[in-house]
UniProtKB/Swiss-Prot annotation:
Keywords: Endoplasmic reticulum, Ion channel, Ion transport, Membrane, Potassium, Potassium channel, Potassium transport, Transmembrane, Transmembrane helix, Transport. Residues 246-284 are annotated as: Disordered. The keyword Lipid metabolism does not apply. It catalyses: K(+)(in) = K(+)(out). Channel activity is activated by increased cytosolic Ca(2+) levels and blocked by luminal high Ca(2+) levels. Intracellular monovalent cation channel required for maintenance of rapid intracellular calcium release. Acts as a potassium counter-ion channel that functions in synchronization with calcium release from intracellular stores. Activated by increased cytosolic Ca(2+) levels. This is Trimeric intracellular cation channel type B-A. GO terms for biological process: regulation of release of sequestered calcium ion into cytosol. The lineage of its organism: Eukaryota, Metazoa, Chordata, Craniata, Vertebrata. It is a multi-pass membrane protein. Residues 1-15, 69-79, 122-137, 196-206 are lumenal.
Length: 284
């Protein structure tokens, strides 16, 4: 147990710059490039492509700044990170023969950088929770919101990023249909907020290690199995039925109404039989 505790302490002291930040930028820019029409936008308007990639890379910081009434442009003040992310953007989109993109698209390398990006997610959530606490003492909801925004800001502002590329898909709003990264970031924000308020009987560095190991394990498993379904789905479905009920779809309501109407309505054969019996009674 002591060795595990020492490991978690050393892990919590890891520096994200430059290697983990680089992995985050590479994965984010590659994700931006793989969106529909992204290469066409890069050829026609490099500035729009660059801005879209920066939203993927720094969306969490921008969104959390807006929520805390801080200048969102402050993200640009970190010249080193902006230059690093911009260099990676250029190499992902414009490197000759796509050698840079294809190198990191190679599955073993992509698994490594994807795992490193999940490590940065933990640090971003924790920094958001801590930053919110410095503004609003013990405001749990605010701390959860800012931690969530900083850890999953790129997904939460995806509609705005789509507008930069000239695309409008309101049905893809993360609040309507949350993706796995947004869900797991929300869970992480809740956990780190409860730990920060001493509501969880676990140290911060142990929680950081356990949560990060969970993130990396699930991410690698999903990539190896090519799964896009949320791992939380087996829990979400029964919980939704228990807590919020299971409402019938409009099509099911119409079908049930038509079937009940058909059951209550006599058939044509029955009507003909009844009318024949009534005519016989009249003749007699």
């Amino acid at each position: 147990m002591e060795s595990l505790s020492e490991l978690s302490v050393q892990f919590s002291q890891l520096s994200m710059f430059p290697f983990f930040d680089m992995a985050h930028y590479v994965v984010s820019v590659m994700s931006a490039r793989e969106q529909a029409g992204a290469l066409d936008i890069a050829a026609r308007s490099p500035m729009a492509s660059w801005f879209s990639a920066m939203l993927y890379c720094f969306g969490g910081g921008i969104l959390s700044s807006i929520l805390l009434a801080e200048p969102p442009i402050a993200v640009l003040s970190n010249t080193t990170n902006i230059m690093l992310a911009s260099t990676i953007w250029y190499m992902v989109y414009y490197f000759p023969y796509d050698l840079f993109y294809n190198c990191f698209f190679f599955l073993p390398i992509r698994l490594i950088i994807a795992g490193m990006k999940e490590v940065t997610r933990t640090w971003k959530i924790l920094s958001g929770v801590t930053h919110a606490h410095s503004h609003y003492k013990d405001a749990l909801l605010v701390m959860i919101t800012i931690g969530w925004a900083r850890g999953a800001g790129g997904g939460l502002i995806s509609n705005f990023e789509q507008l930069v590329r000239g695309v409008w898909k309101p049905e893809s709003n993360e609040f309507l249909k949350m993706s796995y990264p947004v869900k797991v970031t929300l869970i992480g924000a809740v956990l780190f907020t409860l730990q920060h308020g001493h509501y969880l009987p676990i140290s911060r560095h142990n929680l950081m290690l356990i949560y990060t190991m969970f993130l990396v394990l699930i991410k690698v498993t999903m990539m190896l199995t090519h799964s896009t379904a949320s791992p939380f789905l087996p829990l979400e479905t029964p919980l939704q039925r228990i807590l919020f009920g299971q409402r019938q779809k409009p099509s099911e309501v119409r079908q049930s109404a038509s079937s009940s109407g058909a059951k209550g309505k006599p058939s044509k054969k029955t009507l003909d039989k009844d009318s024949g019996e009534q005519s016989k009674k009249k003749d007699s």
